[in-house]
C-alpha cells in the first residue's frame, strides 16, 4: 500500500508539531526541526515518539 502524500497536509511531528517531509525511497517521514525519522509501515505513518529514530544525513 502506498503512502498518500495528501496526508502531509494534516499530519505533524508529534514532538514539535512541525511539518514533516516524505522520503519515498526510504518510506519515512522526516522532521528536520527535531532531526527525527518516523517509519511508514504498509502506507501508514507511525507517528509515535518512541518509534522515531535520529535523522542521519
UniProtKB/Swiss-Prot annotation:
* Highest taxon, organism lineage: Bacteria
Q: Name one GO cellular component term.
A: cytosol
Annotated family: Belongs to the UPF0434 family.
One matching Pfam family is Trm112p
Protein name (Swiss-Prot/TrEMBL): UPF0434 protein Shal_2504
Amino acid at each position: 500500500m502506498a503512502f498518500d502524500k495528501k496526508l502531509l497536509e494534516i499530519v505533524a511531528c508529534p514532538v514539535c508539531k512541525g511539518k514533516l517531509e516524505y522520503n519515498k525511497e526510504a518510506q519515512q517521514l522526516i522532521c528536520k526541526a527535531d532531526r527525527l525519522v518516523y517509519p511508514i509501515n504498509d502506507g501508514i505513518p507511525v507517528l509515535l515518539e518512541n518509534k522515531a529514530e535520529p535523522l542521519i544525513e
